[in-house]
Amino acid sequence: MIFAPTPPTPPDVPALGDTVTLAVNGVNGAPSSSIVVLLAITLLSVAPALLLMTTSFTKIFVVLSFTRNALGLQGVPPNQVLAGLALFLSLFIMAPVIGDVNELGVQPYLAGDATFTEAVDVGKGPLQAFMLEHTREEDLALLTRAAGLENPEDPSAVPFGTLVPAFLLSELRSAFIMGFVIFVPFLVIDLVVSASLMSMGMMMLPPVMIALPFKLLLFVLVDGWGLVVTALVGSYTGAG
C-alpha cells in the first residue's frame, strides 16, 4: 500500500485588520525578570552619560581639576582619583534626589503599579526639579531660543532635552567662577617667587619649581581640600 505524503501546512498569517499584542509583564502584572535585566543593562550602558549631564559630577570634576592645575601639579592626584572623589561627592549630593526617583518611579514599576512610561514620567520629576533649581534663567532662555521655542511662563514646562544643556552651561559657568577664586592665591605666590628670583639674579632657576612647595604648604595649612569640598557641597545644599 502506497501512502501519499501529507502536504505541509502553511503557518497562520494574521489578517490585515488583526492586531498583534506583545506582553512584557510577568506574574500578577509585575514586569518579568528578563525585562528587568534588560532594563538594568540599558541603564548601565547610559549611566555615564546620565552621570555627566544630569548630576553635579561635571561641576565637581572641573573644580577639582582647576585645583590641581592651580597647584601646578600635572598628574597628582591622577584623573582616576579626581573622578572617584567627584563620583562619591555626587552620590552624596544627589542622595535625596535618587531616593525620590526610586520611591516615585522605580518601586511602583517593579511592583506592577505603573507602566514603564508612567514610571519614567513620574521618576524624572525630582531630577528635573534639581536641574531647574541650579540652572540660570539666562541659560534656559538661550537654549529655548536656539531650539526655536517660545519662552514658557513656567520653567517646569521646559522640555527635558532643552533643560539638560542649559543645566550643563550653568554648571560650567559656576565651576569656572570657583576655579578663578582658587587660582588667585596661587597666582600671587607665583608672582612673589618670580619677583624674588629676579631680584636675586636667579633668572635661570624655574619659578614653578620654587613656588610649588610654598603652594602645597599654603594648601595644607588652610585645609584646602576641605574648603573646596565644603564650597562644592554648599553650592547645592545651601550650607557652608
Give each language-model segment a name.
Residues I2-G240:
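Hydrophobic alpha-helical segments and their helix-loop boundaries in membrane
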